[in-house]
Amino acid sequence: MRTSQFLLATQKETPSDAVVVSHQLMLRAGMIRKLASGLYTWLPMGLRVLRKVEAIVREEMDAAGALEILMPGIQPAELWQESGRWEQYGPELMRLVDRHNREFCLGPTHEEVITDLARNELNSYKQLPINMYQIQTKFRDEIRPRFGLMRGREFVMKDAYSFHADHESLQVTYDRMHLAYSNIFTRLGLKFRPVEADNGSIGGAGSHEFHVLAESGEDDIVFSDGSDYAANIEKAEAIPREKTRPAATEELRLIDTPNTKTIAQLVEGFGLPIEKTVKTLVVHAAEEGKLIALIIRGDHELNEIKASQLEQVANPLVMASEAELRDAIGAGAGSLGPLNLPLPCIIDRSVELMSDFSVGANIDDKHYFGVNWERDLPVPTVADLRNVVAGDPSPDGKGTLEIKRGIEVGHIFQLGTKYSEAMKCQVLGENGKPVNLAMGCYGIGVSRVVAAAIEQNSDENGIIWNDTLAPFQIALVPLRYETDAVREATDKLYADLTAAGFEVLLDDRDKKTSPGIKFADMELIGIPHRIVVSDRGLAEGNLEYKSRTESQPQAIAVADVLSFIQGKVNR
């Protein structure tokens, strides 16, 4: 491809609204252009990369035995109402009404549609297992679209769905898809980790996320330094570092704590170690109209996913209002605690092992200091309520936990019979009786993969593509292309390289574009290999080669350049 026949849309300046590196570089490299908040046009440079990701995803899905289909992007509300997700999904679901007053949504995912297809097309266990996938645009009405393609309102996704007569068959396909995902991200050249995950609004039982490791990632992912244990922070089990509860050494005392509403104020104002404080968070209980208190250590954070999954707690999690607190307890937030609390409470495992700690007195501007379990109050229900922190013991008993940032690019789920039961998706089993189909679903954020790869592979000059993902493998840059010798040598090399199957971008911009600008553009775009053709080099029988990952160029004999490049480019 010649730049004179291509939309080369590089920009020197970084747009002011682009925060993360991938967003900045995709705009500057002419890969995408913003249409509206969370909506982007893919330009030719970016689309070449996107199509390469799609091709690898498609190859590995086909190799894993999945069948490609294509479902409508617009879905009738009836299917979502049937599954129960029309109300559950919330405002992120883009809803619309047609001219006949029928409700629809723009699909963020396709569990309902594929289940409807399966119940109409499958009737016997002999047709199982079956795994179907599509690569399609999805829609989500993000409240704050940000970070370019990382969190947009429209995105390209590969979603696959499998159907099975039993859980054992589902597990086989789930493991096969886990391997396929590992193959995909390995082929894409990404540093990634699969981690245990929560199923969220998709529902079902087991699931794994695949994260590209990057400091700009939105997710905290947790690893053991002594084993292969890995989970996202929502899922990771928090094991207390303490093994036993220390003996009490302080007397219980009621202390005036005026204008002390936060843990930080309590610690600073009274010289308390933060690990000797607790937070009392009151939420709506599962029983309608009731409240329940969740208690964690002052230096820990509530894990809302874990909390919402407790049978005593309403799901989704709803914090009690100030009015509800006053009505139920007689005190406001900042003065609450488990001692003399007129509500049921659940404490975190770490709180159970505390001694001589401080709690709100359930009286405004007062706290109890020197509180101890069993002496001052009984130990209530204990559960895992908090996020893990670095240094916690690994849940598998091997090593301690580290926390890194990750970008979620894939997620696989074992849905079980959640959708088949709700939507009556059945086949006749071996015994001739109806069987609800066990189901798996498997997603990859195809467009997000492009951004994640840039987050992981860039420098101060621009993107650093590997040979697999690069929009072009070779940048061919002639200096003084208007001269006969340079033009002739460049055109011959271009023809030879393209005939050999290489993807080449020939920068044939005229002399108004300086060599420095040409070099800077090719570095910005991230093309892995650059060949420069010049009068001086040709006079010496050489061309200049430079790898995107190396700082210094090297001279290559004109006669050897094709074999040299064949040894350099990973195809």
UniProtKB/Swiss-Prot annotation:
GO molecular-function terms, A-Z: aminoacyl-tRNA deacylase activity; ATP binding; proline-tRNA ligase activity
Primary residence: cytoplasm
GO terms under cellular component: cytosol
Enzyme Commission identifier(s): 6.1.1.15
Localization of this protein: Cytoplasm
Keywords: Aminoacyl-tRNA synthetase, ATP-binding, Cytoplasm, Ligase, Nucleotide-binding, Protein biosynthesis
Pfam families: HGTP_anticodon (PF03129), tRNA-synt_2b (PF00587), tRNA_edit (PF04073)
EC top class, as a word: ligase
Catalytic function, reaction form: tRNA(Pro) + L-proline + ATP = L-prolyl-tRNA(Pro) + AMP + diphosphate
Superkingdom, taxonomy of origin: Bacteria
GO BP annotation list: prolyl-tRNA aminoacylation
InterPro entries: aa-tRNA-synt_IIb, aa-tRNA-synth_II, aa-tRNA-synth_II/BPL/LPL, Anticodon-bd, Anticodon-bd_dom_sf, Pro-tRNA-ligase_IIa, Pro-tRNA-synth_IIa_bac-type, Pro-tRNA-Synthase_IIa_type1
UniProt record similarity statement: Belongs to the class-II aminoacyl-tRNA synthetase family. ProS type 1 subfamily.
PANTHER family per UniProt: MITOCHONDRIAL RIBOSOME PROTEIN L39/PROLYL-TRNA LIGASE FAMILY MEMBER, PROLINE--TRNA LIGASE
Comment on protein domains: Consists of three domains: the N-terminal catalytic domain, the editing domain and the C-terminal anticodon-binding domain.
UniProt subunit comment: Homodimer.
Matches recorded under HAMAP family: Pro_tRNA_synth_type1
Protein's job: Catalyzes the attachment of proline to tRNA(Pro) in a two-step reaction: proline is first activated by ATP to form Pro-AMP and then transferred to the acceptor end of tRNA(Pro). As ProRS can inadvertently accommodate and process non-cognate amino acids such as alanine and cysteine, to avoid such errors it has two additional distinct editing activities against alanine. One activity is designated as 'pretransfer' editing and involves the tRNA(Pro)-independent hydrolysis of activated Ala-AMP.
Protein's recorded name: Proline--tRNA ligase
